[in-house]
């Protein structure tokens, strides 16, 4: 089973590496993990940081201009492979380690 984590980002140069490193470290026992980044037209150095750290995610899709979180989420859903899908904001508001609790249900 694939557990897809969609990460919509907009101007997250200060937090993007930390969140992606935390997601990469997640060790699911029952799921194969898929990390999808959606760059929602960032105008800071987020795009450059993502391009320099491709080993931290499985795929990236970009919107040329900022269309809002809803558009980023919809784009991510179009490209996911997972049977289970979650959204992880890049601003570190939620602890990525909490995603491991999903395995307790299965």
Residue map of PLM features:
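A conserved acidic beta->alpha catalytic loop
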Residues: 39-48, 92
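Conserved donor-nucleotide/metal-binding helix-loop-beta segment in metal-dependent transferases, i.e.
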Residues: 99-106
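Short aromatic/hydrophobic "clamp" motif used to bind/position activated sugar donors
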Residues: 85
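Cell-envelope/extracellular polymer assembly enzymes that use nucleotide-activated donors
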Residues: 2-4, 34
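Catalytic metal- and UDP-sugar-binding loop of GT-A-like glycosyltransferases, i.e.
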Residues: 63, 88-90
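Short, well-formed alpha-helical segments that are part of the catalytic scaffolds
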Residues: 12-26
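Donor nucleotide-sugar binding loop of glycosyltransferases
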Residues: 12-15, 42, 69, 95
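Conserved donor nucleotide-binding strand/loop of the catalytic core
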Residues: 33, 47-79
